[in-house]
């Protein structure tokens, strides 16, 4: 058996094409979606990540609003920048790029974000809505990586309802919100969330119809852990140094040999990562469409 590749690049491209159509419709109404980014410091990885988001925006027709602060910015500087993004009508949604410099309370800064402009879907208010909204349509932004995982599974016709999903990792950006999302009515999965204190994690993974590895441990999930035919999504990334060349490379949580056992497998890179970026755009477009509906209601 050779796994069907869950191609995140191709799937994200399809999502972005659909978003571009919706964005054109918004522009025809005089509404231009805008994504803001707040970057503090000059970390090369963060700069590259933010630049990629703005390239995505240009590709689909979303305006970019970029706020860059120096590495020695104070917490007051960051607070002022967030307040500016909250009040700027050109900003439909925005992100605060992490990590922030030492001495700045990240959680306190993130809580200052207007929940309606939370493009990452990780504001406490929006996570709370995900907890409470077990059925019906959610109008609040969803965490991007969990939403991207669900979107990719659905587009590849991988069954979710009634399936046993094992998530390796309980982080805030993937593990915890993914469990909440997958157990909502309409998706109806049974989810086991594993972590460093889980007993016999291999046995837990072997029971899974869908495995999501999001812990940041290189090649943790081995072929013998995986039930034949299971769908496996490789989310975690670790920077591993090649002892022969001395060069670092990005490595996923899933051993490549899992491809000979799994029914579906997302590569890493080019798997879930592009879907995360696409769902960030989707959150911005959804917020713009919400604003359009509110404007129409006010006009009567």
UniProtKB/Swiss-Prot annotation:
Biological processes per GO annotation: L-histidine biosynthetic process; methionine biosynthetic process; purine nucleotide biosynthetic process; tetrahydrofolate interconversion
A Pfam family assignment: THF_DHG_CYH
InterPro entries xrefs: Aminoacid_DH-like_N_sf (IPR046346), NAD(P)-bd_dom_sf (IPR036291), THF_DH/CycHdrlase (IPR000672), THF_DH/CycHdrlase_cat_dom (IPR020630), THF_DH/CycHdrlase_NAD-bd_dom (IPR020631)
Pathway field: One-carbon metabolism; tetrahydrofolate interconversion
A GO CC annotation given for this chain: cytosol
UniProt GO MF annotations: methenyltetrahydrofolate cyclohydrolase activity; methylenetetrahydrofolate dehydrogenase (NADP+) activity
Family in the record: Belongs to the tetrahydrofolate dehydrogenase/cyclohydrolase family.
Protein name (record): Bifunctional protein FolD
Designated gene of the protein: folD
